[in-house]
Swiss-Prot record:
Record note on disruption phenotype: Knockout mice develop ciliated cells with normal-appearing cilia and histology. However, ciliary beat frequency was lower in airways from knockout mice compared with control mice in presence of calcium (20% lower in the absence of stimulation, 35% lower after ATP stimulation). Knockout mice show reduced mucociliary clearance. Knockout mice do not seem to show endoplasmic reticulum stress response.
Tissues and organs where the protein is expressed, per its UniProt entry: Expressed in the ciliated cells of the airway epithelium. Not detected in the mucous cells.
Signal peptide: 1-20
Domain of life assignment: Eukaryota
Principal subcellular localisation of the protein: endoplasmic reticulum
A GO CC term attached to the entry: endoplasmic reticulum
Record-given protein name: Anterior gradient protein 3
Similarity comment: family membership: Belongs to the AGR family.
Keyword vocabulary terms for this entry: Cytoplasm, Endoplasmic reticulum, Signal
Species name: Mus musculus (Mouse)
Location in or out of the cell: Endoplasmic reticulum; Cytoplasm
Amino acid sequence: MLHSALALCLLLITVSSNLAIAIKKEKRPPQTLSRGWGDDITWVQTYEEGLFHARKSNKPLMVIHHLEDCQYCQALKKEFAKNEEIQEMAQNDFIMLNLMHETTDKNLSPDGQYVPRIMFVDPSLTVRADITGRYSNRLYTYEPQDLPMLVDNMKKALRLIQSEL
């Protein structure tokens, strides 16, 4: 009786350890801060970290406010991630942050809290409320067809650094 109980225990231990190994080997998608906006871009995790890196590197911070369940955000994200010019500028010339929640800085929502919303902050830590999209009722929103304007606004943010700082 003791012998069979011991054998049963060993069998249970073997099965459970093999199961644990199989679970560990299961492939999981990597967790990334890009959230689909561009996996080759270096993203910061928080607004405070973004401000620190913007000041340190003398690059503008681009803040993208979005939500996963927003169809407009998803459409913009898809085109943003496919646009090579935006991806290159974002990787090389900007500190990048995408947020799915609001920050405590009220300057990042001068005309309200809505998504998608893209704001620029220069290295002197000034929110550039003068860099706007094409909509008068949502100044900082962009739609997929607005990507040429977003490219122009990214270039404008870079020019303003050179001329003002």
